[in-house]
Every structure is written in C-alpha cells, then in structure tokens.
Amino acid sequence: MNYHTYFGRESAPVECCIVGTGGFGRSFIAQSLKTPLISTRVAVDLKAQTATDVLRGLGIDPSRIAQCATASEAKTAWENGHYIAAGDLSVVLDLPISVVVEATGHPEAGAKHCRLAIDAGKHVALVSKEVDSVVGPGLALRARNNNVIVTPVDGDQPSLLMGLVTWAEVLGLDIIAAGKASEYDFVYDPKQRTLSSNGKTASAHDFGDWIEPATLDLSTIAARRSEIAAEFPQRAVPDLCEMTLVANA
C-alpha cells in the first residue's frame, strides 16, 4: 500500500484531542510533534495541571500552554495558537478538532467521553479497550447515526487480528480459530528446567517434553502446557477485552 495515496503532500494536518495523558497519551503527543500530518494541541486529563505537566515534559514552551476551564477560554487559546490543557472534555469540543483519541482506560469515563465527542460531531479513535469491549457496538451505531466514525486504533493487537482474519476471509479461507498473545511472555530455561513470566520463576520439569511432543493433538498440548504453568496467571483482563473487540468486529 502506498500511503501517499492517502496522505498527499498538500494534505492539512488532522487536528486531534487526546483524552488521558498517561503512557499512551504522552507517547501519542510526542509522536504527533514529529508527524507533519497530525496536530495534537489539545490534551485532557482529570486535572488540567496533569495535562500541562505532560506537555511541558515533552518540551513544549510553557508560555504556549493554556489551562482552560471554560469553552470561551479554550476558544481564545486556540485562536492564539496555544496548546490547551483541560480537565473536562466538554470544554474543548467546540474547537475545530476532527478526532478525539480516548485513552483513559476507564470504562465509565471513556464511554462518556465517546458519547460527548460523537454528539459533537467528532470522530473517535478508541484506544480504551475497556470501553470498546463493553459498549463498542453501541458507540459505533451512535457514531453512524451522527455521520462520524468510532474505530479501534491500528497497530494494537485487536486491529491487527481483525486485519489478519478479514484478509484470510477475502482470500476465501475458512477461519476456524483466532487468538492473540498473552500480555506476558513465558520463557522456558531448558538447562534449569524453569519457567519465567513477569518477574516470577517456577520449576517446570516436564515442560521440555511438550516443546516438541510426540502427539500432534493441539488441544492436548495446550492443556498440558497450561497445567504445568498453573502457578502463573495465564489470562489477564486486557486479553479478554481485546478478544471481545475482535469478536464484536
């Protein structure tokens, strides 16, 4: 795929608002500072000061950052070319932003943010799988009725799996199963005969017998490996959320 067919040299930057300035949000702003066709001048968190601190930490001149508590303040700051830090999404929804990136990871707050954004005519990039797995289909319908889009973000495991499955279906292949990697890796040490995961190590004397087992029955192999690794959590909430996204797709 040639991305220049989607983003021509004369394209205007997409104006974004990030909601949630934690790990993902901070990284998104940092990347947008280096990406010509993405502009993220608006950051929202529980406290405007939190968003301000993130913007400053990314090297943005403090004199160019405005903390805004009202829509009027946000409008003035935008017109003056400032970055905007707010503690309430509703304060910034009248600005000429095209996409709200929801990255709080909080189910109730995230659902509210999506509803507000959709009703304001903004597209939503829904990073918070905790939201998408519960109310994603409903949000998608609401967005469709408002002529905007709600979408998972490309590059995360759910979107990659959706792409792989639909690619296979277009080729005419029958999909009999789909899965994803766990949040944590399991590392087997054949010399010590131990299994390690997420900072914990445990004895796994029989695990080596199931690396290249004599049986080809996959269900038996998976069950035995799971039994040997019983001391470790093998499913996490993010795993379940992400697979629900794929199932809903």
Enumerate the language-model features and the residues they cover.
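N-terminal glycine-/serine-/threonine-rich beta1-alpha1-beta2 phosphate-ribose binding loop
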Residues: 1-116
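Catalytic cores of large soluble enzymes that bind and process phosphate-bearing ligands
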Residues: 16, 20, 43, 131, ...
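Short acidic, glycine/serine/threonine-rich loops at helix termini
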Residues: 55-56, 136-139, 162-165, 186-193
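Short, hinge-like loop/turn segments at secondary-structure boundaries
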Residues: 58-62, 143-145, 168-170, 193-196
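Rossmann-fold NAD(P)-binding glycine/threonine-rich loop
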Residues: 104-120, 127-156, 161-167
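Active-site-lining helix/loop region of Rossmann-like oxidoreductase modules
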Residues: 166-249
